[in-house]
Curated annotation (Swiss-Prot):
Glycosylation sites: N76, N100, N281, N321, N452
Signal peptide: 1-20
Top-rank taxon: Viruses
Family: Belongs to the herpesviridae UL82 family.
Entry keyword set: Glycoprotein, Signal
Pfam families linked: Herpes_UL82_83
Gene: U54
Protein name, entry field: Protein U54
Length: 459
């Protein structure tokens, strides 16, 4: 008797899906097939096109809100019609366990010298409250002298100012190395850096605003409250770009540095001036969000280097708003994710599945090639005979040249509501399978695609 829901676990699931549909040249569509996963702990679930697939699909992460019924994208990048009933969509799904790092985006940076001749404001009063391992500072500054800067997004105001705080009789050992902003009296003002020079604490203050939405100008007075704690973070950012790089637990959400209305010819870029340090322990891995009509490159974010993201349009008139999410950065130990020195640029990341075998010349990664096998229209869930649960295998990202062995992956619990003709050709063991194959016409349902237009809102 067919179970109401198929359930199984696997390190890698390969989809080899067919459907009675034809994609025109350049056509991009989204679909669901009823496949879901149980939420994994501290892992990012990725989907990537297999190198055997004629249909393209972006390398992306699955948003947790979509775990119940995963959406996929399929794109015909050829000049010919693509018959999805004859040429299957081939995707690989796997989960990477990221490091649960702590991130300090506003460290107190000690410097030796600073130009003290031009006092940047008329009045500054500070109250220091000492709680042992915490110092709270309440600041009032007036007659602030703002300096205009040129933003990357031309519809925005950008002004910088310094606020100097005399430490008075506060012991330097109470000026701890990690700061947290508790209150700023103006919503368009942020603190990008905090510097300590002798008995002077310097707040590098930023006023940034979209004047098309809010034509208020920079404030002449500010009330600020911040706290300092002796916190040693795994990742230390060189500056705080809170509207663009938002620190989460275990990841950083990356937002666009400007408003973008795409064309089909010219790639566009977002660059971030912030770098990070981790004492050579971690490497950042930027994984794009699935955005309709926009292709975003995956990249390695190396320590002490700025983050640089390249995009291009797959459809006309797709819009990305300032600070709109482009993807997330996850951090991995350098033993798993080495620096990205040998990356080949590619708009469409592809993957393959391999088995580690011993040869006379040493270990070899033998590609698991399934492309030569015809895909039945009848849906089925199978395993590959020689890829047993005990075997050493993994997944390789071709452009990034990164191999994730099985010990660096997390098995996923999958579930699927099957059709009457769906065959499950193995009994799910207690041990997760290394590789499972879901193939055939499982009932793909194409879903409406919406342009990335959204009402404009200030961050």
């Amino acid at each position: 008797m067919q179970p109401a829901t198929l359930q199984w676990s696997s390190y890698v699931l390969q989809l080899r899906l067919t459907t009675a549909a034809i994609l025109k040249p350049g056509e991009l569509r989204y679909f669901k097939c009823g496949l879901g996963i149980c939420p994994p702990s501290s892992s990012v679930v990725c989907t990537c096109r297999d190198e055997s697939s004629f249909a393209a699909s972006p390398f992306t992460y699955i948003d947790p809100k979509d775990y119940g019924n995963i959406p996929f994208a399929v794109h015909n990048i050829s000049d010919l019609d693509l018959d999805l009933g004859r040429l299957p969509i081939v995707l690989n799904i796997f989960a990477l366990p990221y490091a649960n790092v702590t991130v300090s985006n506003l460290p107190v940076q000690r410097i030796e010298a600073y130009d003290r001749h031009a006092i940047p404001h008329g009045q500054c009063e500070a109250q220091f409250i000492l709680y042992g391992p915490l110092t709270r500072i309440k600041i009032y500054a007036a007659d602030i002298r703002w300096t205009e800067k040129t933003p990357e997004e031309p519809t925005r105001y950008l002004f910088n100012a310094d606020i100097w705080i005399n430490l008075q009789n506060t012991p330097l050992d109470q000026i701890f190395n990690s700061a947290k902003i508790e209150f700023i009296s103006h919503r368009h003002v942020s603190i990008s850096r905090i510097l300590l020079c002798g008995n002077l604490l310097i707040l590098k203050t930023v006023y940034e605003n979209d004047y098309l939405l809010d034509d208020t100008f920079f404030p002449e007075k500010l009330n600020i409250q911040l706290s300092l704690t002796p916190h040693t973070a795994d990742i230390t950012m060189s500056q705080n770009q809170e509207t663009l790089l938002k620190c989460n637990v275990g990841s950083i959400t990356v937002g666009a540095t400007k408003n973008i209305v795409s064309n089909l010819i010219t790639p566009f870029h977002c660059s971030f001036h912030t770098i990070f340090e981790s004492n050579s322990n971690f490497t950042g891995f930027f994984i794009p969000k699935l955005l309709h009509g926009i292709s975003i490159t995956t990249c390695i974010w190396d320590e002490t280097r700025p983050l640089y993201i390249t995009m291009k349009a797959q459809k006309k008139n797709c819009r990305i708003n300032y600070s709109q999410e482009l993807g997330k950065v996850f951090f991995f130990p350098k033993q798993i994710l080495p620096p990205g020195n040998n990356i080949e640029f590619s708009w469409t990341e592809m993957s393959n599945i391999y088995v580690n075998i011993e040869s006379p010349n040493g270990p070899v990664k033998d590609i698991v090639a399934l492309a030569s096998q015809p895909v039945s229209r009848a849906p089925s869930l199978t395993t590959v005979a020689h890829v047993t649960p005990e075997i050493s295998m993994g997944i390789f990202l071709k452009s990034l040249r990164i191999a994730f062995d099985k010990e660096h992956l997390v098995p996923l619990h999958f579930f699927l509501k099957p059709g009457e003709s769906t065959r499950m050709e193995f009994m799910p063991p207690e041990t997760p399978q290394s590789l499972t194959i879901l193939e055939g016409d499982v009932g793909i349902r194409f879903i409406p695609c919406h342009n990335n237009y959204s009402h404009r809102s200030s961050p």
